[in-house]
Amino acid sequence: MARSIDPAPRAVRGFVPARTDEERFLMRHVEDLARAAEGRGIARYSGFLSDREQDLARAALNRADVPESDHHFEGGWPGAARKLLCLEPEGCYPASPLCCVKLTCRTLSGAALPGHKDYLGSLMGLELRREALGDIVLLADTPGTAYVFALETAGELICRELLQVGRTEVTTTLLSLDEVPEFPQAERKTQTATVSSLRLDAVLAAMLHCSRGQACEWIAAGRVEINHLPAESAHAPVYEGDVFTVRGKGRFGLTALPGKSKKDRSIIEFFQY
């Protein structure tokens, strides 16, 4: 694809402040954890946070003037999406509540294996709170095996109570983080397209190979999120690094905006999760 010589200036999406009572409560909770950690010199940990919740936590820590050296986010493996906030002041004794449960399917050869939604549904059926569960990792080279990152109390409950996922019987093994194997990084195929403008409807249409009108219908129906927040307008600008979720269609990451084509159309680079 032909490109212009001069790339477009790189713009980034700014922080979106808390919008709901739940988000404001989360920020206050993070500040309370930070004060307890600093005031008592002991480690404190949140539950698992989504990408959006991690952004809110960072804003709360910044507001509370917590040094970067006193906190980090940990999800159990390098590619984790859902992570704990770990507040560990200098000199404290770390006591992370993070663990991993290995689930192994007991099924006949050739039988259908559970997918991610099946595992999550069965885990939520144990009446676990979502913040007690991190990533669920399925590996292509070991079909029938899943690794569930969880808080220790949730991991112990999973080992006691989870007997099957869907119609498939499973065995459970509680692992320390040191026992978790190294997962291969997912290979994601980057795609390139050109759009008439860097508006949400145009970019979604290119990613999903549909018309802009169809993209607008999905946005109006509340099926589209940008960075885990509901998309409010088809005309919303998009930025490098944005993540788009379209219910029923998938999730897409906008990795780069290299500039303009010779036909003066904006070039986008993206991948599907």
Q: Predicted regions: what is each one?
A:
Residues 1-201, 207, 230, 244, ...:
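Ferredoxin-like alpha/beta domains used as RNA- or RNAP-binding modules
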